[in-house]
């Protein structure tokens, strides 16, 4: 009887423990103190500093069963999971490690003993093949002369990836870090499975499967590509538990091992699925492992970094559950079966079972609200698609509005042989990021570098200019005593009217000046209790201790004040119009625009946007007083003051009230009365992620400018339509009606022309073994008319096979029609596929009708010429 996965895991650890190895527990899936890694993706991650000589352990040999996730960054297997036999988001890596202890000889001998000894895994020796790095003669000789593997089963692999050391047999965790040559062990499943040995053209087949990678850690790769010898040569090995389990349990797919069979049955039970071969069951069985263990290790679903990868995996699983027909939340119900099947490796998960289940349930419920609508939109877009690629804007809209990660959209498209324009998606994402970034040329880098022990007193609520004294100067993050003309620096004063960026409000700009100098302030930031004025000394020199006159850019500050006060009014209005679930998730207030992120699960309707706009403007017309009070935090909360997202508050807080309409904690600068704002207009509403919406708006002169711009556009349209603003709608309706009528007439003419063309074409059909064959390239015919023409020709010709093509804007459109009495011998889908392949495209359809597209118009004549021979062979 074959070993269970749990028994295999334990046997591996027991074997290496018997060889003097310390059994070390799996580390967290979240790498500690390693910014180069998104997730733990190999057994050696927790020993990286040991290999680098930066850390010492009280053992020189170790063995682990390490939990790993590969679903983001360099090692991203997500898109393949469920569609192949061996790709997973989560897997366990069995490993043994030597830290300056044994090296190549013992590492190879240990591996061979474990794999082939009757006491352990007892694999047939003749089924094992090995590879070595091309120049690693030492490893080659150990395998040949000491282990006794025939030369024909030892394969040297060189730099096969286009660069020095870029080889399947030279291992490196990333662009930098520990690396070295490796030897890999492969298992031959037998000649009944297609595939060739490693290094052969057929190596991607499933016959020869890598089961163990033994890395001889000799170097530390630097950022410039140089290889520095490690302090002590070491060994890092990795053997996928799921892969070796498949070998030992005599199955060819990881999803057929006992662990996955149990999980797949559990998935079928909670979703109501009956076909256990359905790939969606495999996807979900894999994904519950990564999701549950990531949450147990502290990762929460979110819209950035690790949290977003987790969210993507959860949503992919939920979508596959939807495909299986799951009628209610199901994913969280798999945590219990997972704990049971993991055995001792699931103890950490068991302790956190309740929390993991709750997080999964909440996330699934949140996504379920938009999944159906998003899938309906995607189905609609795919139905309209004429080519084989979904545009990036649509993919982004699915992400932005419905929370569809692009790989989920790609999954749906993949099932229909459609690609996704991921470059277009990234362009749309980057545009959103661009809008989200505050264009500050200073500040961010300085924040990380500067440490100021002194404090600055902010007096900008009541003053826009005052005298202060320089208490510190920083250039490139380092404290200096003086600066000269042309130098960029951070100037710290004892007191200042400049507002430092905080609570979403940008820092002030302005000037620090004296008798012999002028310092242009481009930004203002906080450094602990100090306020730093960031900019450039335009003239003269400045030193610590100098007196300065600090002048804030008054006009800019005034515009910021209006925008900030309007943000408070809008927040309160959103809660009235949409509901009290609205809470602030972030904001940006500068002199040009205000941006406000808030919790809401769907795009705002036009009437909701108008209602918010009207409500804010009503408060502006009320000319409410804007008042501030300093009070205890608890008293402010009791008063109902709303706190700002992401801010920390002292025990004494500043409470800002706008009449009876809005009360918030706020340290920003504001107008005196709401009437000062003048006018408020919303210019955009969009999503930043599922459950978070973003509004951008303008006030005062900026709002008036948008009114003028709208009026100018209306005037231009009215002029073009020879009307005026009073009858513009009627004019547009008239033009649209005339356009519809002309389009209808044009369509009728096209159909008449197509019918005439069909009549002319029918005479060109030739007889092939009793069947009429018609192949023709048409010019001036719209692709969508081809189907009508094929239907007409089939009616005219009887037993027939038809292939029509047309080229428009460099793209080939193809259609094939086969009369039903011929489809047992010739299928339209196969025929069109043969032609499409020759013109750089693909397609498909029913046996009697199929369509395709292509990009190589020059190849079309030859492709059409090949139809007669292909059809003749089929009709023989």
Swiss-Prot record:
Q: Does this entry carry the keyword Thylakoid?
A: no
Pfam families, A to Z: DHHA1, tRNA-synt_2c, tRNA_SAD
Provide the cofactor list for this protein.
Zn(2+)
Top enzyme class, one word, equals ligase
Keywords annotated in UniProt: Acetylation, Aminoacyl-tRNA synthetase, ATP-binding, Cytoplasm, Ligase, Metal-binding, Nucleotide-binding, Protein biosynthesis, RNA-binding, tRNA-binding, Zinc
Entries under SUPFAM superfamilies matching the protein: Class II aaRS and biotin synthetases, Putative anticodon-binding domain of alanyl-tRNA synthetase (AlaRS), ThrRS/AlaRS common domain, Translation proteins
What does the entry list under GO cellular component? cytosol
Among InterPro entries, the record links this protein to:
aa-tRNA-synth_II/BPL/LPL, Ala-tRNA-lgiase_IIc, Ala-tRNA-ligase_IIc_anticod-bd, Ala-tRNA-synth_IIc_core, Ala-tRNA-synth_IIc_N, Ala-tRNA_ligase, Ala_tRNA_ligase_euk/bac, DHHA1_dom
Q: What molecular function does GO assign, one term?
A: aminoacyl-tRNA deacylase activity
Query: Which catalytic reaction applies to this protein?
Result: tRNA(Ala) + L-alanine + ATP = L-alanyl-tRNA(Ala) + AMP + diphosphate
Q: What is its EC number?
A: 6.1.1.7
Q: How is the cofactor bound?
A: Binds 1 zinc ion per subunit.
N6-acetyllysine occurs at: 74
Record: residues binding Zn(2+): 564, 568, 666, 670
Where does the protein end up? Cytoplasm
The record's Gene Ontology biological-process terms are: alanyl-tRNA aminoacylation; negative regulation of DNA-templated transcription
Which NCBIfam families does the entry mention?
Answer: alaS (TIGR00344)
UniProt remark on domains? Consists of three domains; the N-terminal catalytic domain, the editing domain and the C-terminal C-Ala domain. The editing domain removes incorrectly charged amino acids, while the C-Ala domain, along with tRNA(Ala), serves as a bridge to cooperatively bring together the editing and aminoacylation centers thus stimulating deacylation of misacylated tRNAs.
Q: Return the protein name.
A: Alanine--tRNA ligase
UniProt gene name = alaS
